[in-house]
């Protein structure tokens, strides 16, 4: 249902024609920008409340002044409206909603499902067969967990392509963090037992694991296997030491603790997670707010958005009562396998957890505001150094990374006045240039970035300053790229490495040839260094990933008759390109979809042989 009034919007009239059913409403500005998404138990009553009387605050006044149309979606119940509201807020990011800003998916511990399971950190879609434990509140918690598992249980962490082609144990075995299943140092039965123990450990069943270790230790002693008994004893001692450090609740609770702090128009929500009584650590969120929301409203928005994406534990402790808590409990319980309880005003040990979360939220917010103030000072110093008229709202920096021209990747990082905007980072895989031609790579990356902005008319995504990691030559290429797509209003600055590549001695190069030497103590240069270093980091990580993928697949892709499916079958069968290269023609021909003739072609291509040489080799293999 839509009212298409071109200039003014009659909210009362629109509301009068709405249903009393539950649903979701959306408010739009004249340029079709989505201003706000909300849910309602009764659409008519909720929408009418915006237009009856004076708005409660300046934020609401400013928003309603921009509304030119609304539309609604009716749902079967209010819980369904809540879920739809969360989906729309996350996907459409309305200007006036409290937005949970988190650019990264949560980390999990992955235990793969194969003959010799691998354990590893995992982020992103869960497409690898195996069991996923988590999510954990942060990377530190996962790395600490994996560190402990490798030390105690010695499971492998290597990729299959490495595992299947080892001829001797790797360094992880030498330092006591892997049992070397790749070369059968450990028996399959013993490795499977270690996997079982890791599973108990990750499930939080440490008491059960301890009982099993005690029984196994007794059996080993009875059979006079004293070395095995000693290893089990040491494992049990380490496990108990870990329990004493990490367990804070003997009743082994699964719960999250949330607290919200707000100051000077900014907010921090702190999440403290416990699983099976074990403290998994904290994670801080800094939601985008409009400065006038109460902490209870911010916390309510966070809870609804966060747990719409991640499974909630049975118990969630809050530092205060939040709006719609009953509705949230019902919606979460309906989508979970257990009842979800939101609690505040708790006592005893749980009150201590809440107090700890509140204190940490306040400290985190104070630290963040201090960091933002310092960043604004540096940003202002850049403005003054470069002679810009207005404040800097957005800067970008490009960098190129490759290895002798292989797998060239360009990065583009984005900063605003208070720090990095990671959700807008971009990488560009460079193709169609002479390998190692950094000038052509830079020109291609900048053209691709700005051509899209021009085509989509995204003026707000154009930077005030575009930093180029390089000297006058790179700067000239960047200018050519901008001219090619018709962009003229962007200030270009080259960042040339200093004498002996020492930090603090960088030279800033302008298009007119002017050189600036701010010096190591300059706040402006500190800001520029941060941006440049981030561009370099982002480029090199992208390059390494592309190089690894290229080395795994490109040689096979160049062979006529090898498509994506056959290539995948080969890599899966042999565990990687090295395994394919080590195989004989007869072995290659056993792979699904590979004929004898194609196997000969593959063997010849990978070994640089002629057809006759390949035929002779086939008789040998």
Curated annotation (Swiss-Prot):
Oligomeric form and interacting partners: Interacts with UvrB in an incision complex.
GO BP annotations, alphabetical order: nucleotide-excision repair; SOS response
Family to which the UniProt record says this protein belongs: Belongs to the UvrC family.
Keyword DNA damage: yes
Domain UVR: 207-242
Key word DNA damage present: yes
Protein name: UvrABC system protein C
Entry's localization field: Cytoplasm
Domain GIY-YIG: start-end pairs: 20-98
UniProtKB keywords: Cytoplasm, DNA damage, DNA excision, DNA repair, Excision nuclease, SOS response
Classification via HAMAP family: UvrC (MF_00203)
Function summary: The UvrABC repair system catalyzes the recognition and processing of DNA lesions. UvrC both incises the 5' and 3' sides of the lesion. The N-terminal half is responsible for the 3' incision and the C-terminal half is responsible for the 5' incision.
Major subcellular location class: cytoplasm
Organism: Xylella fastidiosa (strain Temecula1 / ATCC 700964)
GO molecular function per UniProt: DNA binding; excinuclease ABC activity
Pfam family, one: GIY-YIG
Gene Ontology CC: one annotated term: cytoplasm
Residues of the signal peptide: none
């Amino acid at each position: 249902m839509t009212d298409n009034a071109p200039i003014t919007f009659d909210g009362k009239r629109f509301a009068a024609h709405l249903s009393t059913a539950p649903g979701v409403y959306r408010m739009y500005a004249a340029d079709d920008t989505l201003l706000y998404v909300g849910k309602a138990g009764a659409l008519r009553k909720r929408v009418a409340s915006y237009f009856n009387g004076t708005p409660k605050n300046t934020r609401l006044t400013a928003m309603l002044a921009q509304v030119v149309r609304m539309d609604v979606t009716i749902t079967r119940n209010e819980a369904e409206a809540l879920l739809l509201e969360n989906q729309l807020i996350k996907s459409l990011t309305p200007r006036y909603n409290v937005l949970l800003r988190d650019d990264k998916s949560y980390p999990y511990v992955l235990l793969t499902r194969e003959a010799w399971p691998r354990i590893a950190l995992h982020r992103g879609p869960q497409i690898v067969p195996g069991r996923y434990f988590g999510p954990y509140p942060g990377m530190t918690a996962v790395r600490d967990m994996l560190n402990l598992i490798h030390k105690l249980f010695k499971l492998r962490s290597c990729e299959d392509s490495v595992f299947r082609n080892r001829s001797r144990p790797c360094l992880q075995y030498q330092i006591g963090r892997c049992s070397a299943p790749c070369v059968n140092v450990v028996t399959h039965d013993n490795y499977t037992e270690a996997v079982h123990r890791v599973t108990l450990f990750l499930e939080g069943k440490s008491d059960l694991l301890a009982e099993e270790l005690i029984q196994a230790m007794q059996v080993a002693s009875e059979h006079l296997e004293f070395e095995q008994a000693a290893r089990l004893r040491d494992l049990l001692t380490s496990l108990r030491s870990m329990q004493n450090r990490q367990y804070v609740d003997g009743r082994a609770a699964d719960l999250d603790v949330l607290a919200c702090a707000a100051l000077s128009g900014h907010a921090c929500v702190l999440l403290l997670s416990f699983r099976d009584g074990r403290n998994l650590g904290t994670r801080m969120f800094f939601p985008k707010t409009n400065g006038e929301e109460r902490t209870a409203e911010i916390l309510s928005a966070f809870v609804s958005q966060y747990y719409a994406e991640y499974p909630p534990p049975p118990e969630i402790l809050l530092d205060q009562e939040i709006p719609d808590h009953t509705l949230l409990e019902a919606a979460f319980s309906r989508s979970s396998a257990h009842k979800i309880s939101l609690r505040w005003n708790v006592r005893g040990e749980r009150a201590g957890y809440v107090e700890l979360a509140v204190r940490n939220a306040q400290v985190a917010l104070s630290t963040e505001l201090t960091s933002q103030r310092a960043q604004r000072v540096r940003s202002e110093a850049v403005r003054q150094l470069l002679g810009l008229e207005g404040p800097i709202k957005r800067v970008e920096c490009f960098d190129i990374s490759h290895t002798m021209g292989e797998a060239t990747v360009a990065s583009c990082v984005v900063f605003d006045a208070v720090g990095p905007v990671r959700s807008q980072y971009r990488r560009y895989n460079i193709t169609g240039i002479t390998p190692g031609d950094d000038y052509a790579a830079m020109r291609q990356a900048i053209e691709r970035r700005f051509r899209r902005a021009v085509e989509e008319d995204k003026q707000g995504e154009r930077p005030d300053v575009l930093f180029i990691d390089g000297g006058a030559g790179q700067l000239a290429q960047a200018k050519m790229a901008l001219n090619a797509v018709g962009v003229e209003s962007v200030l270009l600055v080259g960042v040339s490495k200093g004498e002996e590549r020492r930090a603090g001695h960088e030279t800033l190069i302008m298009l007119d040839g002017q050189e600036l030497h701010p010096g190591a103590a300059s706040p402006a240069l500190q800001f520029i260094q941060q941006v440049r270093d981030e561009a370099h980091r982002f480029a090199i990580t992208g390059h390494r990933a592309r190089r690894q993928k290229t080395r795994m697949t490109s040689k096979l892709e160049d062979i006529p008759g090898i498509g994506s499916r056959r290539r995948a079958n080969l890599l899966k069968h042999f565990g990687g390109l090295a395994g394919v290269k080590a195989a004989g023609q007869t072995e290659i021909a056993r792979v699904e979809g590979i004929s004898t003739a194609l196997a000969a072609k593959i063997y010849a291509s990978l070994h640089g042989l002629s057809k006759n040489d390949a035929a002779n080799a086939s008789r040998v293999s």
